Design a protein with these regions (language model features):
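General structural signal for secondary-structure boundaries
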Residues: 41-45, 64-66, 196-205, 290
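Transmembrane alpha-helical segments and their cytosolic interface motifs
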Residues: 9-24, 187-243
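N-terminal first transmembrane alpha-helix
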Residues: 1-129, 133, 143, 346
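Membrane-proximal, non-transmembrane interface segments of integral membrane proteins
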Residues: 89-221
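Long, hydrophobic, amphipathic alpha-helical segments used as structural scaffolds
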Residues: 92, 96, 233, 275-278, ...
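Juxtamembrane "helix exit" motif at the C-terminal ends of alpha-helical transmembrane segments
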Residues: 28-47, 86, 224-250
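Cytosolic/matrix-facing juxtamembrane and C-terminal tails of multi-pass cellular membrane proteins
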Residues: 1-16, 47, 206, 210-217, ...
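Pore-lining and gate-forming transmembrane alpha-helices of multi-pass membrane transport proteins
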Residues: 70, 74, 233-237, 241-257, ...
C-alpha cells in the first residue's frame, strides 16, 4: 500500500510539474525578458543579461532567506499561471467544440449562427459537386466504363475540409465530434447520449485507455490555444510576443483538429464494435448491429420522461364533484402552475 501511494504521489508530482510549473515558468521567463528588453531593443542579449544580473544583485535576494522566498514565489507564480492556462483551456475547448453554442451570450451566439450558416452553404456546394461525381461514376459503371477517380476524391476532400457531415456547429472540430452522433443515428438508430454511459462501463480496459488518452490530447491541444491568449498581452511591452502568439494559435488549431478527429474516430469505432455487448448484457440478443437492434437498444436505455404534473388545484372542472362547504378564510393568491418540463405530449 505504501509503495502504491508513493508511486501515485510521484506521478501526480510529475503531472503537476509538466502541466503547470514548467509552462508557467517559461511564461514568467518570457515576461521578464519582455519587461527588460522592450520594443526598441527586442533581441539585445547583453542588455537582458545586464538586467538579470542587476536583479540578482539586489539585497532582497542576496541572502539565503531571500533566495528561498524568491524560489517559492517563482514556483507559486508559475503554478498560478499554469492554472490560469488550464481555466482558459476549458473555455477555448468549449469554443472549439461549440456543443452548446445556441445557449451562448447573444452577441457570440449571433456570430456563431452566421458562421454556421456560411459553413453550411459551403458544405452544400461541395456536397453537390461530390454527389454529381458519384452519380457520373455510377452511370459509367452501369455502361461498363470507368471515370477518373481524382475529381471525385478531390470533391470529397473539399467537402470534408468544411465538415465531415452537414454542419451544425460553427467549428470544424465541433462538427467532427458531432458527426459521430449523426452517423450512429443514421446507420443504426442509436442515441449516443443514452448509450455511451452504459457502453463505457462495459468497454475493455485497453479501449478505455485509448479513448481517455485521446480525450486528454484534445484538452492539451485546446490549452495550447489558451497559452496564446496569455502571451498576447506581452506584445504591449515586447513585440516578438505577437509572433509567439501566432505560432501558438496555429499550432493549437492544427493539434485541436487532429485530436478531435482521433477522439471522434475512437468513439465511433468503440460504439460500432461493442454496442452489441451492451445489448447482450441487457438480454436483447447478440444479433449483428442493425437499425432494428439499434432501435431496441435505444428504447431500452432511454430513461422515461417525467410524468405529467397534476392539474392546478385552483382550476375547477364541470365534471368535478362539488366541494364540501368550509368556513371562509382570508383569500390567498393562487400559485401559478409549473409548466411541464419535458413531459410527453399525447
Amino acid at each position: 500500500m505504501g509503495d502504491m501511494l508513493a508511486e501515485l504521489g510521484k506521478k501526480l508530482a510529475e503531472r503537476w510539474l509538466s502541466l503547470l510549473v514548467l509552462p508557467g515558468a517559461l511564461y514568467l521567463a518570457v515576461s521578464a525578458a519582455a519587461v527588460a528588453l522592450g520594443h526598441d531593443r527586442p533581441f539585445d542579449l547583453p542588455r537582458l543579461t545586464s538586467r538579470i544580473t542587476s536583479w540578482a544583485d539586489s539585497p532582497a535576494v542576496g541572502s539565503a532567506g531571500g533566495r528561498v522566498v524568491l524560489s517559492a514565489a517563482v514556483l507559486a507564480g508559475a503554478a498560478a499561471v499554469g492554472l490560469a492556462a488550464q481555466a482558459l483551456g476549458s473555455l477555448t475547448e468549449q469554443l472549439h467544440l461549440a456543443a452548446d453554442w445556441p445557449a451562448w451570450p447573444p452577441g457570440l451566439r449571433h456570430l456563431a449562427h452566421r458562421v454556421t450558416g456560411r459553413r453550411r452553404a459551403r458544405w452544400e456546394d461541395a456536397a453537390r459537386t461530390w454527389h454529381r461525381h458519384r452519380d457520373e461514376a455510377a452511370a459509367a459503371r452501369a455502361r461498363g466504363a470507368r471515370t477518373a477517380a481524382l475529381p471525385r476524391q478531390s470533391a470529397r476532400a473539399a467537402m470534408t475540409r468544411v465538415s465531415p457531415e452537414h454542419p451544425e456547429r460553427p467549428t470544424w472540430s465541433g462538427d467532427r465530434v458531432h458527426a459521430v452522433t449523426v452517423r450512429l443515428e443514421r446507420d443504426y438508430h442509436l442515441d449516443l447520449a443514452a448509450l455511451w454511459p452504459h457502453l463505457w462501463l462495459t468497454l475493455p480496459d485497453h479501449v478505455r485507455t485509448e479513448i481517455s488518452a485521446a480525450r486528454q490530447a484534445l484538452t492539451r491541444a485546446t490549452t495550447l490555444t489558451a497559452w496564446a491568449l496569455l502571451y498576447l498581452p506581452l506584445a504591449a511591452w515586447w513585440w516578438p510576443a505577437t509572433g509567439i502568439t501566432v505560432v501558438l494559435v496555429l499550432t493549437g488549431r492544427r493539434r485541436t483538429r487532429a485530436a478531435a478527429d482521433t477522439y471522434a474516430t475512437l468513439l465511433e469505432a468503440a460504439v460500432r464494435l461493442h454496442a452489441r455487448d451492451v445489448a447482450d448484457r441487457l438480454g436483447l440478443g447478440s444479433d449483428p448491429l442493425s437499425r432494428e437492434s439499434g432501435d431496441a437498444l435505444t428504447r431500452h436505455l432511454t430513461p422515461s420522461t417525467p410524468p405529467r404534473p397534476p392539474r392546478d388545484s385552483t382550476l375547477t372542472d364541470a365534471s368535478d364533484p362539488p366541494a364540501a362547504p368550509v368556513r371562509p378564510s382570508p383569500p390567498v393568491p393562487p400559485v401559478p402552475p409549473v409548466p411541464p418540463q419535458g413531459a410527453r405530449r399525447s
